[in-house]
Amino acid sequence: MTPKRALISLTSYHGPFYKDGAKTGVFVVEILRSFDTFEKHGFEVDFVSETGGFGWDEHYLPKSFIGGEDKMNFETKNSAFNKALARIKTANEVNASDYKVFFASAGHGALFDYPKAKNLQDIASKIYANGGVIAAICHGPLLFDGLIDIKTTRPLIEGKAITGFPLEGEIALGVDDILRSRKLTTVERVANKNGAKYLAPIHPWDDYSITDGKLVTGVNANSSYSTTIRAINALYS
């Protein structure tokens, strides 16, 4: 029997972002929880980024942000999570036909590279065209900017409902002015630009995720589990 396989994308950007000079990059909690959930449901999981590189968002490292099983999986060198991470691929090394689910993780680093990550977008569109699922969490839906449905040649999210990290959350984190000064976009703007309907959570830190056919989106790291479960369920619906 062919194993079920999921591909989790990471942002390649790792550079200064915050007012204190700290770097942004991958939000580790999102990939820890999505990886663990896929594995517990029988999936083989690989990681990919546009360039094959990545770095952690320094404001959300495990020592101050997570504990329990997440912390153990991150800190144990030979954990399944770290073994998979050590095998991270560049986007042009990936064969889309090997995977049934594409899961776009985020962190503020995604603001910089996802909208122009053409190779990641190509993988996602091919998985979707083959009957697979595209899922994205937090800032992950920025990958949808310019992502084309191969069958219709229209924006893949056109006419669909999506969610993602809201502007209200950026304001609460004190980074909305950084987005403006660096001309970085938001999930809601990407939705509007590509003909999708953006559904906001009641509060930016709520566990909130939605499914629209084979397209699944979640708001934040607190939504990692529910978004992953929705992606798995969407695959078999």
Curated annotation (Swiss-Prot):
GO biological process: cellular response to nutrient levels; chaperone-mediated protein folding; methylglyoxal catabolic process to D-lactate via S-lactoyl-glutathione
Cell compartment(s), UniProt: Cytoplasm, P-body
Predominant location: cytoplasm
GO CC entries: cytoplasm; P-body
Keyword Oxidoreductase: no
Keyword Cytoplasm tagged: yes
UniProtKB keywords: Cytoplasm, Lyase, Stress response
Catalytic activity: methylglyoxal + H2O = (R)-lactate + H(+)
GO MF term set: glyoxalase III activity; protein folding chaperone
E.C. number(s) listed in UniProt: 4.2.1.130
Cited function: Catalyzes the conversion of methylglyoxal (MG) to D-lactate in a single glutathione (GSH)-independent step. May play a role in detoxifying endogenously produced glyoxals. Involved in protection against reactive oxygen species (ROS). Important for viability in stationary phase. May negatively regulate TORC1 in response to nutrient limitation.
Complexes and interactors: Homodimer.
Protein name listed in UniProt: Probable glutathione-independent glyoxalase HSP33
Annotated source species: Saccharomyces cerevisiae (strain ATCC 204508 / S288c) (Baker's yeast)
